[in-house]
Protein backbone atom coordinates (compact mmCIF):
# COMPACT_ATOMS: atom_id res chain seq x y z
CA UNK A 1 0.00 0.00 0.00
CA UNK A 2 1.27 3.45 -0.88
CA UNK A 3 1.81 6.07 1.79
CA UNK A 4 -0.45 9.15 1.51
CA UNK A 5 1.53 12.16 0.29
CA UNK A 6 -0.80 15.08 0.88
CA UNK A 7 -2.16 15.07 -2.66
CA UNK A 8 -5.57 13.52 -3.24
CA UNK A 9 -9.08 13.88 -1.90
CA UNK A 10 -10.97 13.40 1.33
CA UNK A 11 -14.72 13.04 0.82
CA UNK A 12 -17.58 12.32 3.22
CA UNK A 13 -19.75 9.49 1.81
CA UNK A 14 -22.46 7.01 2.75
CA UNK A 15 -23.76 3.65 1.63
CA UNK A 16 -26.47 1.29 2.79
CA UNK A 17 -27.83 -2.25 2.77
CA UNK A 18 -31.59 -2.83 2.62
CA UNK A 19 -33.41 -6.11 3.19
CA UNK A 20 -30.55 -7.75 5.09
CA UNK A 21 -31.65 -11.16 6.25
CA UNK A 22 -35.07 -11.67 4.73
CA UNK A 23 -35.19 -15.28 5.92
CA UNK A 24 -33.68 -16.92 2.87
CA UNK A 25 -30.27 -15.47 3.59
CA UNK A 26 -30.03 -16.28 7.28
CA UNK A 27 -26.38 -16.50 8.36
CA UNK A 28 -25.11 -15.44 4.93
CA UNK A 29 -22.74 -12.48 4.89
CA UNK A 30 -23.74 -9.33 2.99
CA UNK A 31 -20.82 -7.09 2.02
CA UNK A 32 -20.86 -3.30 1.87
CA UNK A 33 -20.29 -2.07 -1.70
CA UNK A 34 -18.24 1.12 -1.37
CA UNK A 35 -18.94 2.14 -4.99
CA UNK A 36 -22.73 1.98 -4.59
CA UNK A 37 -25.18 4.04 -2.57
CA UNK A 38 -27.28 0.98 -1.75
CA UNK A 39 -27.04 -2.81 -1.76
CA UNK A 40 -30.43 -4.54 -1.85
CA UNK A 41 -29.36 -8.13 -2.42
CA UNK A 42 -26.62 -10.30 -1.07
CA UNK A 43 -23.42 -8.97 -2.61
CA UNK A 44 -20.20 -10.81 -3.20
CA UNK A 45 -17.21 -9.53 -1.33
CA UNK A 46 -16.73 -5.86 -2.13
CA UNK A 47 -13.38 -4.57 -0.94
CA UNK A 48 -11.87 -1.15 -0.37
CA UNK A 49 -10.25 0.04 -3.61
CA UNK A 50 -6.51 0.44 -4.05
CA UNK A 51 -5.11 3.83 -2.97
CA UNK A 52 -8.09 4.44 -0.65
CA UNK A 53 -8.34 4.47 3.12
CA UNK A 54 -11.84 4.52 4.63
CA UNK A 55 -12.60 5.84 8.09
CA UNK A 56 -15.97 4.52 9.21
CA UNK A 57 -17.77 7.22 11.19
CA UNK A 58 -20.97 5.44 12.14
CA UNK A 59 -23.07 2.38 11.40
CA UNK A 60 -26.83 2.53 12.01
CA UNK A 61 -28.70 -0.78 12.02
CA UNK A 62 -32.52 -0.83 12.06
CA UNK A 63 -34.63 -3.95 12.62
CA UNK A 64 -37.84 -3.43 10.64
CA UNK A 65 -39.54 -6.55 11.96
CA UNK A 66 -42.70 -5.75 13.91
CA UNK A 67 -42.59 -8.98 15.92
CA UNK A 68 -39.08 -10.29 16.51
CA UNK A 69 -35.67 -9.22 17.74
CA UNK A 70 -32.66 -10.42 15.77
CA UNK A 71 -28.95 -10.76 16.52
CA UNK A 72 -26.60 -9.02 14.08
CA UNK A 73 -22.94 -9.70 13.32
CA UNK A 74 -20.61 -7.08 11.83
CA UNK A 75 -17.11 -8.10 10.79
CA UNK A 76 -14.09 -7.18 8.70
CA UNK A 77 -12.13 -9.41 6.38
CA UNK A 78 -8.66 -7.89 6.25
CA UNK A 79 -6.49 -7.67 3.16
CA UNK A 80 -3.88 -9.84 4.84
CA UNK A 81 -6.37 -12.71 5.00
CA UNK A 82 -6.72 -14.87 8.04
CA UNK A 83 -9.78 -15.03 10.21
CA UNK A 84 -12.85 -12.84 10.11
CA UNK A 85 -12.46 -10.04 12.66
CA UNK A 86 -15.78 -9.54 14.47
CA UNK A 87 -16.69 -6.01 15.54
CA UNK A 88 -20.19 -7.04 16.69
CA UNK A 89 -21.26 -10.59 17.48
CA UNK A 90 -24.86 -11.52 18.24
CA UNK A 91 -25.77 -7.89 18.95
CA UNK A 92 -29.49 -8.18 19.65
CA UNK A 93 -31.71 -5.58 18.02
CA UNK A 94 -35.28 -5.43 19.31
CA UNK A 95 -38.25 -5.47 16.95
CA UNK A 96 -38.67 -2.01 15.42
CA UNK A 97 -35.38 -1.15 17.16
CA UNK A 98 -32.23 0.69 16.13
CA UNK A 99 -28.61 0.09 17.12
CA UNK A 100 -25.95 2.73 16.50
CA UNK A 101 -22.27 1.77 16.36
CA UNK A 102 -20.34 5.05 16.39
CA UNK A 103 -16.84 3.90 17.28
CA UNK A 104 -14.52 4.93 14.45
CA UNK A 105 -12.41 2.34 12.67
CA UNK A 106 -10.27 2.25 9.55
CA UNK A 107 -10.38 0.00 6.50
CA UNK A 108 -7.39 -0.35 4.18
CA UNK A 109 -7.29 -1.42 0.52
CA UNK A 110 -8.70 -4.93 -0.01
CA UNK A 111 -10.46 -4.96 3.41
CA UNK A 112 -14.17 -5.87 3.35
CA UNK A 113 -16.93 -4.85 5.82
CA UNK A 114 -19.76 -7.36 6.11
CA UNK A 115 -22.99 -7.99 8.03
CA UNK A 116 -25.33 -10.90 8.69
CA UNK A 117 -28.52 -11.64 10.60
CA UNK A 118 -27.49 -14.49 12.85
CA UNK A 119 -30.85 -16.19 13.41
CA UNK A 120 -33.07 -18.41 11.29
CA UNK A 121 -36.36 -16.58 10.88
CA UNK A 122 -38.52 -15.62 7.96
CA UNK A 123 -39.51 -12.20 9.25
CA UNK A 124 -36.09 -10.58 9.55
CA UNK A 125 -35.74 -7.39 7.56
CA UNK A 126 -32.87 -5.17 8.54
CA UNK A 127 -31.39 -1.97 7.12
CA UNK A 128 -27.79 -0.86 7.57
CA UNK A 129 -26.55 2.70 6.93
CA UNK A 130 -22.81 3.42 6.92
CA UNK A 131 -21.24 6.89 6.85
CA UNK A 132 -17.52 7.17 6.14
CA UNK A 133 -14.62 9.34 5.00
CA UNK A 134 -12.99 8.18 1.78
CA UNK A 135 -9.36 9.28 1.52
CA UNK A 136 -8.01 8.79 -1.99
CA UNK A 137 -4.35 9.46 -2.64
Task: List PLM regions with ranges.
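Beta-strand elements of well-folded, non-transmembrane domains
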Residues: 63, 76-78, 132-136
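A short beta-strand element within beta-rich, extracytoplasmic domains
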Residues: 53-64, 115
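Short proline/glycine- and polar residue-rich coil/turn motifs
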Residues: 91-97
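Exposed aromatic-hydrophobic patches
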Residues: 98-104
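Short, surface-exposed beta-strand/strand-loop-strand elements in extracellular ectodomains
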Residues: 66-89
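Noncatalytic modules at the cell exterior or secretory-pathway interfaces
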Residues: 104-122
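C-terminal interaction-tip segments
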Residues: 1-52, 117-137
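Extended, low-complexity, turn-rich repeat/linker tracts enriched in Gly/Pro/Ser/Thr and Asp/Glu
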Residues: 62-70, 119-126
Amino acid sequence: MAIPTGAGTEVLKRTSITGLGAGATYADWWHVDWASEEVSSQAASAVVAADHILTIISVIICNQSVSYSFPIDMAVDTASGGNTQFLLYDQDIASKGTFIFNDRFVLHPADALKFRVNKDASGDNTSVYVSFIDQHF
